[in-house]
């Protein structure tokens, strides 16, 4: 295995760990409309844009497990959703799309929206009363607040990917 790839994967892992600690530290990120952002969602989506399918799947599963530990839901739910989502985002970017900020925003809007809607549907809708109130007052603000961090995380991961990729591979 190439050393650049090992260092890049370690950097992504460290990034996920730091973002997990930032999102779980009470009072560090102020809540907006009672919602706190999930920084791992944009991180794994943007990592998937710069990696091939299998590493994207792996980082989606790792980020999802961190979310499962922090968001207190069914263990494995976010790992499954984010793993599959990152696999398909990586495949789409490799085959049909270019990796740029517009694509990152589009995939982030759709991917994070899909993840939040699945989270609401499977973890809230059948278990509690007033699901529409919960969606509009908790899940929708969390979705919008999380989207604010997408450009910052995209440029961080683009810089990591370009700096830690071999020269002949980065020209492709």
What are these regions (language model features)?
Residues 1-172:
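Terminal, non-globular segments
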């Amino acid at each position: 295995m190439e050393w650049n790839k090992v260092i890049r994967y370690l950097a992504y892992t460290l990034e996920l760990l730091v973002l997990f600690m930032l999102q779980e530290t009470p009072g560090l990120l102020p809540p907006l409309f009672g919602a706190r952002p999930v920084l791992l969602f944009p991180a794994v989506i943007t990592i998937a844009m710069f990696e091939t399918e299998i590493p994207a799947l792996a980082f989606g599963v790792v980020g999802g497990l961190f979310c499962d530990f922090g968001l207190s839901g069914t263990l494995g739910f976010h790992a499954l959703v984010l793993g599959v989502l990152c696999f398909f985002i990586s495949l789409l970017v490799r085959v049909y799309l270019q990796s740029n900020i517009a694509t990152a925003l589009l995939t982030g809007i759709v991917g994070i929206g899909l993840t939040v809607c699945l989270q609401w549907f499977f973890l809230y809708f059948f278990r509690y009363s007033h699901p529409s109130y919960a969606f509009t007052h908790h899940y929708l603000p969390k979705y919008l607040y999380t989207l604010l961090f997408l450009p910052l995380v995209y440029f961080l991961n683009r810089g990591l990917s370009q700096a830690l990729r071999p020269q002949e591979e980065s020209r492709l």
